[in-house]
């Protein structure tokens, strides 16, 4: 399940940047955007399944940290969607980019720091 979740995130980020580049070039990115929305569903479902498997075995404050990681992941998805919708409507996206980047850094940090993630830190 972990590999499926990581693959879904990687594909989601790739589709996000492809859709962003299409919108910023003034072309239609609706099809890529819809594919990205499908990836959102897969990311949320696999993330929730991972969270539920962790709840069964985690001890101490691990529930809280994984809950915060899940919340930050949902903020990343919300930030991605808001950036693309505002881009398609030609509205400013500065604040939404800030939310997206801060949440993405938090998700990567927690993903690498917590026990299921890679042992970088």
Curated annotation (Swiss-Prot):
Locations listed in the record: Cell membrane
Keyword hit for RNA-binding: no
Chief place where the protein resides: membrane
Bridged cysteine pairs (disulfide): none
Pfam families linked: DUF1516
Organism per entry: Bacillus cereus (strain ATCC 14579 / DSM 31 / CCUG 7414 / JCM 2152 / NBRC 15305 / NCIMB 9373 / NCTC 2599 / NRRL B-3711)
Membrane protein topology class: Multi-pass membrane protein
Chain ranges passing through the membrane: 6-26, 38-58, 65-85, 92-112
Family, as annotated: Belongs to the UPF0344 family.
Keyword Membrane: yes
Top-level taxonomic group: Bacteria
InterPro entries cross-referenced by the UniProt entry: UPF0344
A GO CC term assigned to this protein in UniProt: plasma membrane
Name this protein carries in UniProt: UPF0344 protein BC_1150
Keywords linked to the UniProt accession: Cell membrane, Membrane, Transmembrane, Transmembrane helix
HAMAP family tied to this protein: UPF0344
């Amino acid at each position: 399940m972990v590999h499926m979740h990581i693959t879904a995130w990687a594909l989601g980020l790739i589709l996000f940047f492809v859709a962003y580049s299409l919108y910023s070039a003034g072309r239609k990115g609706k099809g890529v955007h819809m594919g990205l929305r499908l990836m959102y569903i897969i990311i949320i479902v696999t993330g929730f399944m991972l969270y539920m498997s962790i709840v069964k075995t985690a001890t101490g404050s691990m529930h809280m940290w994984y809950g915060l990681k899940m919340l930050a992941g949902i903020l990343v998805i919300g930030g991605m969607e808001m950036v693309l919708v505002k881009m398609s409507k030609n509205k400013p996206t500065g604040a939404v980019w800030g939310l997206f980047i801060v949440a993405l850094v938090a998700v990567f940090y927690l993903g690498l720091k917590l026990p299921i993630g890679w042992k970088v830190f």
